[in-house]
Amino acid sequence: MMERNNYRLPAEWERQDFMQLTWPHENTDWAPILDRITEVYVNMAREIARRERLLIVTQKSADSLRAMLSEHLGDAEMARITFFECDTNDTWARDHGFITLVSDGGKRLLDYCFNGWGMKFAAEKDNAINAKLKETLSGDYADRLDFVLEGGSIESDGCGTIITTSQCLLAPNRNQPMTKEQIEAQLKADLCADRVLWLDYGNLVGDDTDGHIDTIVRLAPNDTLLYIASDDPDDEQFEDFRCLERQLKELRTASGEPYNLLRLPMPDAIIEDGERLPATYANFVILNGAVLVPTYGQPGKDAEAMRIIGGAFPDREIIGIDSRAVIVQHGSLHCCTMQFPSIP
């Protein structure tokens, strides 16, 4: 167990030092649509680098990637980008990246085990990125490789509350035979948290992660929860998400008050090769001064989601990013990114 020393896991809307992307390449599952996914990553890189520093982990040559990006980004954006060459299995920085705590005196870089969402996919290269990257970053490195934890499986309000899902953290392919009580104790100790709120519903059809919180419920300022819900009784997910909504209404803040709930629409089903993909508007990315919202070529629902998210973040520009290529591999924008917070 770690001593607290005033460390905490900041909320994502707090000031960020930089953001990480892990770049797609031809030896990943992106190969059949590499041009399409590269376009999405270029769009993300542009919006990030306009507002904060960007770290790009890349298996391909940094020089060739820099040259390609310079054709699409301005000099000011390119000056904010740092490249780090490293072998990678895939691109999901949210789940293989560092989870970073801050205190008045510095940062703590928590390196957890990433096992491909319960050994579903090869992850040995991605699991080794942080140990290589640590030499280039400021902060105290903390080896937590004996515990499986993905960044997409937790949400923090920055004030001691962690929200997660039981279907993911209690999955037998993660930290078995640890009990729920043991896992909660580990989270509180490692993340310097006072309490952990567990959600038991809301698993998207097609989700490979066993129910990451960042696909269904997100924290926002002023004790606000943004969550997805279905209005279609014929949707196979309708009942599960109705149960999630009921559970959210029962949650209380640390001061005992109900959360402010903002309901996001459920995208119309997106089918690929006969299977439904886990499209969600909850997988947005918070930047300094902006929020990147995944869109799915559904003008009405895309606009509604952006409007609702804008209401939760009135001081930020709301930017839609076409994420139809990303969802082909069962993820979205938040899954592609990992923020490194600034020291207060």
Where are these regions (language model features)?
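The feature marks the mature, well-folded catalytic cores of soluble enzymes
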Residues: 1-344
